[in-house]
């Protein structure tokens, strides 16, 4: 997040990261014809326009950790709400896109934390060989509401007949978006997974964890295994995946291999390099964003783009929670 031009990589590429960290985004559009594509594209464009150096400087220059987190929460929440409003307005202007909407999940990795903001049922997970597997987001869905109310056992939620019914999204003209936010302290060898319900709606968390655990040293294979797992059980929805590997500093001496280049560690940064494996749907613009390299940056990110599996869309309903 260091320059004004945003790019999508076409081949394996090492991205240096500056003081603004890196941003991971998944937006899973919904609606008839191409309306879902339009909604997710608007959401991504809104996020892109929000993450400018001028706006980010006001946050990253804060020295108080509590003030920084509060500022980031406000910033991400406002960005998601702005995307919601832009989608609603676009729907009013073009009748062919009425009813369009999108989920969104954002992970902003900055300094020694990940800041997560989401609306809908696209998820953010983190895996660490030492600390295990954790879902960092919480679905905005009818089934999750039943679990929260004690009306449904968590182990029965996955197979519930209404597990695709969401209660929040971007683009609903009758209900303004209400995103949630949380932060997470980074650990060495954390692997982040952002995904649409095309993966987590078909594969149990335990299966996702097992695939990441077995392939944590080769996330390209990991990506393939996750997609294959979703397809093996039906694959009725688009599968969008973002994988991000956090690597702690190993040495101050640069290595010869560009893919493993190590830069000197900033004094206030524990984690020196982030390896990003971004697997998204470029056509829908719903998977990920990151900025053009800044050569003077202290961190590096390794990008491995790939195709996202596209299947025939199924309807995703949006409702307000109702008593059971």
Question: What do the PLM-derived regions correspond to, one by one?
Answer:
Residues 1-324:
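PP2C/PPM-type serine/threonine phosphatase catalytic domain
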